[in-house]
Amino acid sequence: MLRALLFDLDGTLADTDPLHLLAWREVLAPYGLEVDPETYRRRISGRLNPEIVRDLLGLKGEEARRLIEAKEARFRELAQDLEPTPGLYGLLEEAGRRGLTWGVVTNAPRANARHVLQALRLAPPLLVLAEEVGRGKPDPLPYRVALARLGLRPEEALAFEDSPSGVRSAVGAGIPTYGLLTGHEAADLRAAGAQSTLKDFWEALALL
């Protein structure tokens, strides 16, 4: 029996990826690195920040930390007015009527997660941050932690993700997972293990 809905944050609850792309472009420009949408999808989306700067620039330590902080501060400046993915509030309302709980499982830093959730006027009963559990997506640990905190089996939850990395994380934890078509191709999400893809959360109502 379904008892919980688990959501990724960026690109899933709201289409924040264009803002992340802009912030990355600005902070990486002084390094002579141009980030186009395809590079963002392949090398940035769904990954932890330390992995990103190590991959793109070979940076680690204090310089990497300063770059990451600058990027995330710029993202929060840009993300002042966010709109939820269509159907999100309706899905959460229907889930509440059915007695389902819900949570957010994200690779985002805590400050970003709080900012986005506040902008969307959301207060999830559960928030799992990859940076606090020790491993990020695509590792299944964040979703395993979510299940453990809720006291649920994988088949008692549904996960919603927008990136192949996130899909692999949820599927690796055994959770039936659906891909949101906010940035990645449907074929890539299905190849990562998504049962199906959705253009918005109105389509997810039929899953309850």
Which sequence ranges carry the predicted segments?
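Asp-based, Mg2+/Mn2+-dependent phosphohydrolase catalytic module
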Residues: 1-3, 93-96, 100, 109-208
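N-terminal helical cap/lid subdomain that shapes the substrate entry/recognition surface
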Residues: 2-98, 109-114
